[in-house]
């Protein structure tokens, strides 16, 4: 069975230039983590208002987050893998306005920022976090490896 990785764009922002990167990151993370079972994952591009509403409703936070993840595996009572043949990971929401603003703030390309946010979100949804220094080092090293291997580098914009 094949992976079911779907990108939904709920905005007018033109996301097509980033789709190849999202697919490459998805595959690179599977390879690096030796994930062999087929995965199901949704990436949803939203605007600031929708991201704020998601953050308020589900995380009780009153700000626009750059990326929010909703992992199915940690809350699932039934084994969806047995039902579907797919390991259902959940949903990653990226706020395109926040991504563009952060790219400008950090003086690198929107491509790099979208790739970073998707990588960060996918690692979170797979159980990685940065709550302790050791966990942070592990997660951030993996993020750097994914982006470096795909040559999506932090090149300053002039």
Curated annotation (Swiss-Prot):
A GO CC term attached to the entry: cytoplasm
Residue positions binding Zn(2+): 120, 124, 130
Names of the cofactor(s): Zn(2+)
SUPFAM superfamilies: Metalloproteases ('zincins'), catalytic domain (SSF55486)
Coiled-coil residues: none
Gene Ontology process terms (BP): rRNA processing
Cofactor binding mode and count: Binds 1 zinc ion.
Cellular localization per UniProt: Cytoplasm
EC number of the protein: 3.1.-.-
Keyword set, alphabetical order: Cytoplasm, Endonuclease, Hydrolase, Metal-binding, Nuclease, Ribosome biogenesis, rRNA processing, Zinc
Enzyme class (EC, first level): hydrolase
Keyword Nucleotidyltransferase attributed: no
UniProt superkingdom: Bacteria
Pfam families listed in its UniProt record: YbeY
PANTHER family from the UniProt entry: ENDORIBONUCLEASE YBEY, CHLOROPLASTIC
Family statement: Belongs to the endoribonuclease YbeY family.
NCBIfam families listed in its UniProt record: rRNA maturation RNase YbeY
Free-text function comment from the UniProt entry: Single strand-specific metallo-endoribonuclease involved in late-stage 70S ribosome quality control and in maturation of the 3' terminus of the 16S rRNA.
Protein name: Endoribonuclease YbeY
Organism field: Spiroplasma citri
Gene giving rise to this polypeptide: ybeY
